[in-house]
Design a protein with these regions (language model features):
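Detector for Asparagine
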Residues: 46-49, 86, 95, 142
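C-terminal amphipathic alpha-helix
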Residues: 1-34, 91-150
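Alpha-helical segments in soluble extracytoplasmic regions
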Residues: 9-80, 123
Length: 150
């Protein structure tokens, strides 16, 4: 899988993490049945782990990455460490006190994970847009050099 395709996957999954974490925060504040959180927490954990795997694959290819990809990798990795830490804290809080989540740090932990995942989404989306613009620029420059085809 290409680096760009991996970043596209990270873009999609970081948006899902942000959405899931936000739903968890809202559900915890409304004192809903905590059993409903289990599927969402699994999704959160799986998406965080999946992005971790994608970042590891990108890091293994670091020497062959474009400069923008290296920069995106480094910045995304830093943010995802924070997302993972807050997701893990939320899971630990959930496991320790499911019945009173609204009175624990769970809503704040999930809110923080959501906010940080949203930062990842914004960052990666920006890099992907920049890469697309650069590709279009290169194609245009190439077509100007070649001239009209007859």
């Amino acid at each position: 899988m290409s680096a760009k395709a991996l970043f596209e996957q990270i873009d999609i999954k970081s948006a899902e993490i942000a959405d899931v974490a936000q739903r968890l925060e809202e559900q915890a504040k409304s004192a809903q049945d905590p059993q409903g959180h289990i599927v969402e927490l699994d999704t959160l954990r799986n998406d965080v782990n999946s992005i971790g795997g994608e970042l590891t694959m990108l890091d293994a290819e670091r020497l062959s990455l474009a400069p923008w990809e290296v920069e995106a990798l480094d910045r995304t990795t830093t943010l995802m460490v924070d997302v993972a830490a807050n997701a893990e804290k939320a899971i630990e809080t959930f496991n320790s006190d499911r019945t009173h989540l609204w009175a624990t740090a769970f809503p704040a932990e999930t809110a923080k994970a959501s906010s940080e995942a949203d930062e990842v989404k914004t960052l990666v989306s920006g890099y992907l847009k920049l890469a697309k613009a650069r590709e279009q620029e290169a194609r245009l420059e190439n077509s100007l050099r070649v001239g009209p085809q007859e």
